[in-house]
A protein has these predicted regions:
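Phosphate-binding/catalytic loops
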Residues: 82, 86-142
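Conserved active-site segments centered on acidic
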Residues: 1-75, 137-142
């Protein structure tokens, strides 16, 4: 079983939304063999997801309310087969710690919705979803 990790900054908006969308998308389409998680490069462990992230995911029929943020650790890196980054900056930072060929930039970069309106979070969710097919194709190449 492959393990992928969605990574953003605080692990309260983009990466938990991506994890929720990925899990729902793979469940609906019967895609097996790839588990997912999420973490943040500057996360405060135990933080709840952003209210608007929870709200927008609920609109999609996805419940991320129980999610709690976690920081990216060396142990987590060791357990991960591939890392899905939300920005070029995340990818560049991780390239110093993790094999570059196992780093993937989702949707050519996903803008941070933190502090934004519900509509900002909706656009973020759409952008994340738009990158899922490309991610799956990439994952199947290794």
């Amino acid at each position: 079983m492959k393990q992928i990790l969605f990574v953003c900054t605080g692990n309260t908006c983009r990466s938990p939304m991506a994890e929720g969308i990925w899990n729902e998308w793979t469940r609906r389409w019967g895609i097996k063999g790839i588990q997912s998680g999420s973490a943040g490069l500057a996360a405060f462990p135990g933080d709840a997801p952003a209210e608007n992230a929870v709200r927008v995911m609920a609109e999609w029929g996805i419940d991320i309310s129980a999610h709690r943020s976690r920081a990216l650790t060396p142990e987590l890196l060791d357990q991960t087969d591939a890392i899905v980054c939300m920005t070029e900056e995340h990818k560049a930072a991780l390239a110093r710690l993790y094999p570059a060929e196992r780093l993937f930039l989702l949707s050519h970069g996903v803008r941070d919705p933190y502090g934004g309106s519900v509509e900002t979070y909706r656009r973020c969710a759409d952008q994340i979803f738009d990158g899922m097919q490309e991610l799956l194709v990439w994952l199947r190449t290794w």
